[in-house]
């Protein structure tokens, strides 16, 4: 019988986490298209609160979807902390990337065009699951930490320590959000 864990990692990564990316990019494009950025620019709260609140909602929803998927596919035999934190932080990371790409894009088609290389590069850290390289080869990619936590949660071997995976994911969250803040702030000026 084949182990469903590798397929579950792919499903958990692609469905909830990538949904966070697409929704964040589309939310920003919608705000831009509906001319609500002017209203956002005069809010009494900083822009990052607005973005963090949207990303937090997307991340919570993504984590709940991942939990339902994991329970439906495999029951309760998981490393729950790694599964939930890996999904939440990965979605938060990709929401930041989504806001950045959405702010660079003039329309939905341009957003899709910018998304293709980003999504291809983000999927490359899945290659070690097919026996092509190790996670160490893919450290420069933002999705490596989150994928590693999902693999660890499902009992699959990983090349980095648990805390190394968390550190990787937090570092790339900081980088993605710094990029998102810089680009979205330009839209408000």
Predicted regions and their residues:
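Long, hydrophobic alpha-helical segments
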Residues: 7-27
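Transmembrane helix boundary and interhelical loop/hinge segments in multi-pass membrane proteins
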Residues: 21-43
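Junction motif at the cytosolic side of a transmembrane helix
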Residues: 100, 104, 168-189
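Transmembrane helix segments
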Residues: 105-144
């Amino acid at each position: 019988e084949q182990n469903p864990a590798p397929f579950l990692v792919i499903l958990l990564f692609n469905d909830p986490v990538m949904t966070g990316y697409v929704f964040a990019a589309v939310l920003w494009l919608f705000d831009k298209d509906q001319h609500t950025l002017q209203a956002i620019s005069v809010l009494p709260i900083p822009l990052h609160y607005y973005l963090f609140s949207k990303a937090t909602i997307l991340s919570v929803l993504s984590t709940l979807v991942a939990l339902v998927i994991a329970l439906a596919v495999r029951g309760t035999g998981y490393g729950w902390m790694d599964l939930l934190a890996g999904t939440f932080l990965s979605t938060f990371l990709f929401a930041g990337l989504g806001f950045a790409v959405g702010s660079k894009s003039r329309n939905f088609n341009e957003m899709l065009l910018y998304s293709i290389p980003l999504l291809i590069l983000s999927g490359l850290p899945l290659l070690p699951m097919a026996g092509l390289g190790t996670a160490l080869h893919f450290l420069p990619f933002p999705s490596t930490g989150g994928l590693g936590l999902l693999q660890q949660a499902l009992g699959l071997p990983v090349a980095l320590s648990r805390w190394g995976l968390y550190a990787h994911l937090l570092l790339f969250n900081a980088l993605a959000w710094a990029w998102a803040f810089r680009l979205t702030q330009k839209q408000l000026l």
